[in-house]
């Protein structure tokens, strides 16, 4: 089963991706994770990507397509995969089709912008462990401190409100057209397309996705 997850940054795609991956036994291919790994490793591409992401911009198609093509050629993708955060644009979707990468089901998780701003700008991260908190939904025991080590929590540059709003603007401009694109592909019978209300509970959204995929 080859699945694409669509939705704005902060819509909860990562959480649902985890559910789908475990439930169906297919790997999640998150361009964000691939990019963060490159940034952490300090590779030339990683450093270039960090500069772009910190400014709230999107990295080049060339870099992302190279990473994705390499990844889905691996053995664990033989039974399918879940793409999270790719394609972002119609040219990327066209490039996938041109490379013979067919998709069985496209899932969109829809959340209003203001809800996303509240979700993302409230995130706090412990740099040493990667533990993530939220000032409203999952606060640390002591404000601004990691529960385990007591060390300071930080706001990732891409969780700053101004950066979140900039990324949402880019999403609406570049990625929203994919909704129409895959709607047409589905109408032609070449994939299935389902939209979900992402403001519902995580468990409810998971249940609805499972029903749509079965």
From Swiss-Prot:
Pfam families documented for this protein: ADK (PF00406), ADK_lid (PF05191)
GO molecular function term, any single one: ATP binding
Binding locations of AMP: 31, 36, 57-59, 85-88, 92, 156, 167
UniProt: ATP binding residues: 10-15, 123, 132-133, 200
Pathway, per record: Purine metabolism; AMP biosynthesis via salvage pathway; AMP from ADP: step 1/1
SUPFAM superfamilies: P-loop containing nucleoside triphosphate hydrolases
Main location: cytoplasm
Cellular compartment(s): Cytoplasm
Domains: entry comment: Consists of three domains, a large central CORE domain and two small peripheral domains, NMPbind and LID, which undergo movements during catalysis. The LID domain closes over the site of phosphoryl transfer upon ATP binding. Assembling and dissambling the active center during each catalytic cycle provides an effective means to prevent ATP hydrolysis.
Self-association and partners: Monomer.
Protein name stated in the entry: Adenylate kinase
Organism: Shewanella amazonensis (strain ATCC BAA-1098 / SB2B)
Gene it is expressed from: adk
């Amino acid at each position: 089963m080859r699945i694409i997850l669509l939705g704005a940054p902060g819509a909860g795609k990562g959480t649902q991706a985890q559910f789908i991956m475990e439930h169906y036994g297919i790997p999640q291919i998150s361009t964000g994770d691939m990019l963060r790994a490159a940034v952490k490793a300090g590779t030339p591409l990683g450093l270039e990507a960090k500069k772009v992401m910190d400014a709230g911009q999107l990295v080049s198609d060339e870099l992302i397509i190279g990473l994705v093509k390499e990844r889905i050629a691996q053995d664990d993708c033989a039974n399918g995969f879940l793409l999270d955060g790719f394609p972002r644009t119609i040219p990327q979707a066209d490039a996938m089709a041109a490379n013979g990468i067919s998709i069985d089901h496209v899932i969109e998780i829809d959340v209003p912008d203001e809800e996303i701003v509240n979700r993302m700008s409230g995130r706090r991260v412990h740099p040493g462990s990667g533990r993530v908190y939220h000032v409203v939904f999952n606060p640390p025991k002591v404000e601004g401190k990691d529960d385990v080590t007591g060390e300071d929590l930080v706001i990732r540059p891409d969780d700053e409100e101004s950066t979140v709003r900039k990324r949402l603007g880019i999403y609406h401009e570049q990625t929203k057209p994919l909704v129409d694109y895959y709607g047409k592909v589905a109408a032609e019978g070449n994939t299935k397309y389902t939209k979900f209300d992402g403001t519902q509970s995580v468990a409810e959204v998971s249940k609805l996705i499972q029903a749509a995929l079965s």
